[in-house]
């Protein structure tokens, strides 16, 4: 059984695709080295590798500073420094012929080129479409995993069986059961009236603020909730919550009436996104209202969609009247289970050379 190195552009708490892939590889029996986003050694002292979850060991690479990447000489030196740290920790952990799995990040290509030069098996994960430097990354990688079908088929036409589809990763079955069984609302929701339309994440500029404003203005008794800094709506029925740790997301969902995903379909990246939060909603059977992003086209019976404010208002009205014990809620939960980390681990075991 080969081990794995996951290079992420976040921290472990983000619980994004790299973190879920780390959990999947650990389920297969691999020991995993998880590499968080590098930080400046002038800001933080180096910390030892620590065990994040059973079989998953994390560290944060140290560099001089991200600003130095604007010059090719110092950028190349910092890339080698990161590769050195990854290789050193892999050796200290006695990882067995580890596979390196990584998504797109700024300045990650030279790091991965250095690791490839040292003989590591490289697996690139295409998380967005369009993807910056896509051709350079797939040319470097031994294998490519693709989350969106928009990118999948052109890459398979080009590279054949080096490219594999990666279904979006829902939480583990045990975590889904925990989410579904949560009945206590998060205290931050106490001041927010119902019905609550919840975007269970940080928008990062990916939602259509104009659409949201028109909906909230037309329906002042509906309340939009998201996590992270204020979004500029400045409406009494728009609410921004401070950071919510992963173990409290269930409390947010317990107080949610509609899972709300008003992505901006005018932007190609957002039109092609594959939102992880969808499966958090599905895990508890919540009705979901969204703009019609491509990822949802295969599940029209599970999600309410609309392009315009009027269509989305009707979609929310339908979602709010959906029976709580109806069969559609059970089907959502079943789809979340199909996408569980356990099931994706089985897929990875088939497509990655983990047995030697």
Tell me what each language-model feature is.
Residues 302-310, 317-324:
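Conserved acidic donor-binding segment of nucleotide-sugar-dependent glycosyltransferases
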Residues 85-91, 113-114, 127-147, 151, ...:
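Membrane-proximal helix-turn-helix segments that form the acceptor-binding/catalytic region
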Residues 21-24, 171-255, 278, 306-308:
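Conserved catalytic-core segment of nucleotide-activated headgroup transferases in glycan assembly
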Residues 29, 257, 285:
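A short alpha->beta transition loop at the rim of the catalytic pocket in nucleotide-sugar-dependent
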Residues 150, 168-172:
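Carbohydrate-associated surface elements
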Residues 12-16, 204, 247, 251-252, ...:
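Nucleotide-sugar-dependent
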Residues 1-46, 216-217:
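N-terminal subdomain of nucleotide-sugar transferases
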Residues 184, 321-353:
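A charged, aromatic-enriched C-terminal amphipathic alpha-helix characteristic of glycosyltransferases
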């Amino acid at each position: 059984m080969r081990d794995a190195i996951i290079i992420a552009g976040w921290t472990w708490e983000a619980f994004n695709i790299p973190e879920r892939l780390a959990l999947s590889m650990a389920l297969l029996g691999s020991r995993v080295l998880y590499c968080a986003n590098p930080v400046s050694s002038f800001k933080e002292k180096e910390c030892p590798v620590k065990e994040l979850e059973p079989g998953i060991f994390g560290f944060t690479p140290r560099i001089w500073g991200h600003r130095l990447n604007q010059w090719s000489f110092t950028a190349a030196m910092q890339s080698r420094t990161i590769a050195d740290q990854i290789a050193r920790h892999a050796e200290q952990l006695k990882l067995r012929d580890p596979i390196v799995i990584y998504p797109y990040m700024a300045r990650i290509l030279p790091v991965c080129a250095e690791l490839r030069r040292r003989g590591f098996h490289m697996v690139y994960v295409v998380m967005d479409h369009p993807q910056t430097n896509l051709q350079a990354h797939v040319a470097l990688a031994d294998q490519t995993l693709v989350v969106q079908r928009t990118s999948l088929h052109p890459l398979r036409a080009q590279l054949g069986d080096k490219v594999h589809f990666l279904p979006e990763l829902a939480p583990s079955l045990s975590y889904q059961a925990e989410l579904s069984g949560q009945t206590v609302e998060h205290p931050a929701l106490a001041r927010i009236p119902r019905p609550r339309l919840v975007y269970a994440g940080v928008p990062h500029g990916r939602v259509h603020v104009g659409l949201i404003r028109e909906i909230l203005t037309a329906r002042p008794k509906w309340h939009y909730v998201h996590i992270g800094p204020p979004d500029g709506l400045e409406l009494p029925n728009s609410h921004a919550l401070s950071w919510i740790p992963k173990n409290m997301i269930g409390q947010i969902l317990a107080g949610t009436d509609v899972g709300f995903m008003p992505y901006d379909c005018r932007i190609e990246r957002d039109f092609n996104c594959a939102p992880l939060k969808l499966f958090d909603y599905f895990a508890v059977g919540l009705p979901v209202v969204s703009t019609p992003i491509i990822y949802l086209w295969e599940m029209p019976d599970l999600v309410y969609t609309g392009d315009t404010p009027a269509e989305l208002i009707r979609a929310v009205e339908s979602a709010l009247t959906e029976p709580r014990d109806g069969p559609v809620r059970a089907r959502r939960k079943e789809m979340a289970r199909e996408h569980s980390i356990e099931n994706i681990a089985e897929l990875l075991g088939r497509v990655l050379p983990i047995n030697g």
